[in-house]
């Protein structure tokens, strides 16, 4: 004699959804013509989408920040490279 046992609970499949990463808040933080002080973040980015120009430093996570007080200027470096610079306040007043 054989006894057949059936499931008393229905098996439930798992879903492949239900995950989401935390926001990284990337992008331009100070626009063209904005006044910045030393150390202020201009752009948060992954990789060098925008390259540092005059008076702009680059952090280890490719964040661009001001090395001098001045006005932010976005421009092009060559045919297809974007660049951001900070024009010091003394030069901006004279120009």
UniProtKB/Swiss-Prot annotation:
Highest taxon, organism lineage: Bacteria
GO cellular component, one term: cytosolic large ribosomal subunit
Record's comment on post-translational modification: The N-terminus is cleaved by ribosomal processing cysteine protease Prp.
InterPro entries: Ribosomal_bL27, Ribosomal_bL27_CS
GO biological process: translation
Record keywords: Ribonucleoprotein, Ribosomal protein
Propeptide segment residues: 1-6
GO molecular function terms listed in the Swiss-Prot or TrEMBL record: structural constituent of ribosome
Similarity annotation: Belongs to the bacterial ribosomal protein bL27 family.
HAMAP family linked to this entry: Ribosomal_bL27
PANTHER family the record matches: LARGE RIBOSOMAL SUBUNIT PROTEIN BL27M (PTHR15893:SF0), RIBOSOMAL PROTEIN L27 (PTHR15893)
Name of protein: Large ribosomal subunit protein bL27
């Amino acid at each position: 004699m054989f006894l057949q046992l059936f499931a008393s609970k229905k098996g439930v499949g798992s879903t492949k959804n239900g995950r989401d990463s935390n926001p990284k808040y990337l992008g331009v933080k100070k626009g063209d013509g904005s006044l910045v002080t030393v150390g202020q973040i201009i752009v948060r980015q992954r990789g060098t989408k925008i390259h540092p120009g005059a008076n702009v430093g680059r952090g280890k996570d490719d964040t661009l920040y001001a090395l001098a007080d001045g006005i932010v200027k976005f421009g092009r470096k060559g045919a297809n490279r974007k660049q951001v610079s900070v024009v010091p306040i003394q030069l901006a007043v004279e120009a």
